[in-house]
């Protein structure tokens, strides 16, 4: 599995190419269920986006398909990429972490990019002390 950042993750900025952010927003704008996937790259810089099927097929929560997750993680490892973050959408809600997101952030202590169908997006990180902090997003 590719390495992911440790729980003492100190990056305060997520750097994402504009075409990747646009691709995520485009899929989210036409989806009736939460969209999810991985942000792969190096440190805090996104070099690849990988959509993963939401196996819950739900408009209010997501769970990445385990087989697709494994395949994506193996591909990233072959490409020497790390898990920079996880992205998912909220439908008809602001892009802020929910209680369920907080639980996921404890399991995956990386940046979480949350977007909605209005084109709003924010990124978040969970500290070791379970404090959620907003992460600045730089679109290149």
Curated annotation (Swiss-Prot):
Positions of short motif JAMM motif = 88-101
Top EC class, one word: hydrolase
- Give cofactor(s), names only: Zn(2+)
Q: Does the keyword ATP-binding apply?
A: no
Record site: Transition state stabilizer: 98
Q: What is the effect of changing residue 108 to A?
A: Nearly no effect on substrate affinity
Q: Provide one Gene Ontology biological process annotation.
A: proteolysis
Where on this chain does Zn(2+) bind? 88, 90, 101
* Chain ranges of the MPN domain: 13-133
* Stated regulation of activity: Inhibited by EDTA in vitro.
Supply the InterPro entries for this chain.
Answer: JAB_dom_prok, JAMM/MPN+_dom, MPN, VirAsm_ModProt
Reading the lineage from the top rank, the first entry is: Archaea
Q: Which residues are responsible for catalysis?
A: 34 (proton donor/acceptor)
Q: What PROSITE patterns would the database entry show?
A: MPN (PS50249)
| Gene Ontology terms for molecular function | metalloexopeptidase activity; zinc ion binding
UniProt subunit comment: Exists in two major states: monomer and homodimer. Both conformational states are catalytically active.
Role of this protein: Metalloprotease that displays desampylase (DSAMP) activity, cleaving ubiquitin-like small archaeal modifier proteins (SAMP1, SAMP2 and SAMP3) from protein conjugates (isopeptide- and linear-linked). Thus, likely regulates sampylation and the pools of 'free' SAMP available for protein modification. In vitro, is also able to cleave non-physiological ubiquitin (Ub) substrates, such as 'Met1-', 'Lys48-', and 'Lys63'-linked Ub dimers (Ub2), and to remove Ub tags from diverse proteins.
Question: Which protein is depicted?
Answer: Desampylase
């Amino acid at each position: 599995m590719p390495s992911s950042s440790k729980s003492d993750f100190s990056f305060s900025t997520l750097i994402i190419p504009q075409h990747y952010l646009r691709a995520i927003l485009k899929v989210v704008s036409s989806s009736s269920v939460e969209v999810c996937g991985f942000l792969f790259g190096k440190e805090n810089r996104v070099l690849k986006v990988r959509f993963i099927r939401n196996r819950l097929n739900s408009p209010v929560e997501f769970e990445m398909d385990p087989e697709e997750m494994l395949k994506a993680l193996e591909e990233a490892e072959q490409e020497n990429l790390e898990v920079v973050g996880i992205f998912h959408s909220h439908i008809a809600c602001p892009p802020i972490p929910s209680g369920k997101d907080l639980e996921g952030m404890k399991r995956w202590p990386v940046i979480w990019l949350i977007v909605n169908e209005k084109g709003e997006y924010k990124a978040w990180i969970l500290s070791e002390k379970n404090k959620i902090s907003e992460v600045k997003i730089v679109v290149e």
